[in-house]
Amino acid sequence: MTKWKRANPNGTRDYLFEECTLIEEVEQKLRRTFLERGYEEIRTPTIEFYDVFAFQSRPIDEEKMYKFFDEKGRIIVLRPDMTIPLARVVGTQRCDTPLKVTYSGNVFRANESLAGKYNEIVQSGIEVIGIDNVRAEIECVISVIQSLQKLKVQSFTIEIGQVQLYKCIVKKLSIHEEEEKVLRTYIESKNYAALSNFIRDKKLDRCDETVKLLEKLPRLFGNLEVIEEAEKLASSNEMKMAITRVKEIYEAIEKLGYGSYISIDLGMIQHLDYYTGVIFKGYIYEIGEEIVSGGRYDELIGNFGEMLPAVGLAVQVNQIVKALQEQQEPYERKRIDIMIHYELNRLAEAERLRNLLQKDGKKVALSLFSNLNDTFQFARKNQIVTVVEAKSESLVEYVWKEKWVVQKEGETSCVTFKLR
């Protein structure tokens, strides 16, 4: 029964020291940026009822959920998604809209072994609820771009797609559900040969404008020229409106000076079925990993209450941390500046000294050792150059200068008061 006691479950890992600090800093900077832009914070439980994710369209594969039973035999899951629980909150709590919310938390999905993906990840994100015009999408994209800039993430791009255009094509060509799943993989992977064979095998008329658009879909990525090409082949008002929406979002963000951070990919199709319109994916060039995902989901909240339009974007914190580690100098956690060694009957005074010294922005810690030499050894091992000894009625300050020496009177000292 102890076979696995020294191992982590598949798809999970431990985060230590510097990496933990960096994850926390990324989360806090994202949170601060979103709060400054008027978003309000929401927290949902790490565990949810299975039914929350089991509505008709089944947006999350059942096999990807971690499931267990509560004390009453009901099926519980570790949340595999952040947006659906937020939709539950908004739908059941009857929140006033429009509403801008932000969140951060862990998400759990059981990926295939050896797929190179973690089963537990950290997501921070935003949702704009109750607005059906392009201002909602624009607000989300601007917020994420600014947050990534503040994190000093280099060479990233956010792709804008339109799942509604794809759904219009599928509907007009009467492609059945099972066939659509296969078609989706061909378009997402930009498998031109397989897509061409699919059109041939289905005996679709290649002279038909909609079929032409379908065949071109994986190639429609780039800038506004892509929109012009798609508009020429759009055979219904619904298709034209879907394309126009992407154009409006792109132009608005470009006018703000963020054009270098965005591109268009009309062949992008999100794997989550609850998206109904414009969708987004963000990447860092050097890594190729997805760092941002999201889109419009106007029908999701209706599963829990009133039907409300909504847009959301999630930032993959783990991937951001990975990018920062690769593009910057090795991250160094802030080391202890001063260590206080004290006699046990001087604990109160030592803690008072620690509080005073840290007000100057220093990192100060109390020694855990009863012997001064042990404190010195620990300080050297951890590159701490100042040790203050609090004993009886006095303070002695030691500094490392090839050896531990007493700080002489008249030299700059970290000690700002005498023990009473």
From Swiss-Prot:
Pathway: Amino-acid biosynthesis; L-histidine biosynthesis; L-histidine from 5-phospho-alpha-D-ribose 1-diphosphate: step 1/9
Domain of life, per lineage: Bacteria
GO MF terms, alphabetically ordered: catalytic activity, acting on a protein; histidine-tRNA ligase activity; transferase activity
Family annotation (Gene3D superfamilies): Bira Bifunctional Protein, Domain 2
CDD domains in UniProt: HisRS-like_core
Annotated GO biological process: histidyl-tRNA aminoacylation; L-histidine biosynthetic process
Any one Gene Ontology cellular component term annotated for this protein: cytoplasm
Localization annotation: Cytoplasm
Main location: cytoplasm
InterPro entries in the record: aa-tRNA-synth_II, aa-tRNA-synth_II/BPL/LPL, HisRS-like_core, HisRS/HisZ, HisZ
Keywords in alphabetical order: Amino-acid biosynthesis, Cytoplasm, Histidine biosynthesis
Subunit structure: Heteromultimer composed of HisG and HisZ subunits.
UniProt miscellaneous comment: This function is generally fulfilled by the C-terminal part of HisG, which is missing in some bacteria such as this one.
Described purpose of this protein according to its UniProt entry: Required for the first step of histidine biosynthesis. May allow the feedback regulation of ATP phosphoribosyltransferase activity by histidine.
Alphabetized PANTHER family for the sequence: ATP PHOSPHORIBOSYLTRANSFERASE REGULATORY SUBUNIT, HISTIDYL-TRNA SYNTHETASE
Membership in a protein family: Belongs to the class-II aminoacyl-tRNA synthetase family. HisZ subfamily.
Protein name per Swiss-Prot or TrEMBL: ATP phosphoribosyltransferase regulatory subunit
Species name: Bacillus thuringiensis subsp. konkukian (strain 97-27)
